[in-house]
Amino acid sequence: MKTVGEFLAHAIALEEESAVRFDELADALEVHHNAEVTELFRKMAHYSRLHLAEAKEMANGVDVPHIKPWEFEWPDEEAPETPEIEGTHYLMTPYHALSLALESEKRGQGFYQGLADTHENKDVRTLAKDFADEEAEHVKLLSDMIQRYPAPKEGWDEDMDPPNVAD
């Protein structure tokens, strides 16, 4: 990623993928009548869409290239702020949902901060710093919010009558 346009293409994809994944998680937990966690995931998807709109607004008048999914320069296989689906469970609590969201925001913040610290393009560094600062605010907000929810006791995921999938 060399240009502001390429940076914005990454920012747009990052927020879009985050919103889609949070919606997928909300849909999955809604099926299991986990309303509190579903609502938290819907809020996170909404916030991702707000950030997506901000990134798209910044892209007005900028040459933003179309980047093929396999050509994005992510630290891992997925965009850094995409919540890890492996960390979910149909009985997860708000504590778990917030932990998942917090980790995704930390990865997003780290991604942007890394660019702000090391990128050769001054304009990209400046934009990345702004994005990193905003993500740091989200990390703080989620860190404060998670304090309101106690970590669940051991065995929280035990279910004597788990859902079954018919083949």
What are these regions (language model features)?
Residues 1-167:
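Iron-associated oxidoreductase/ferritin-like identity signal
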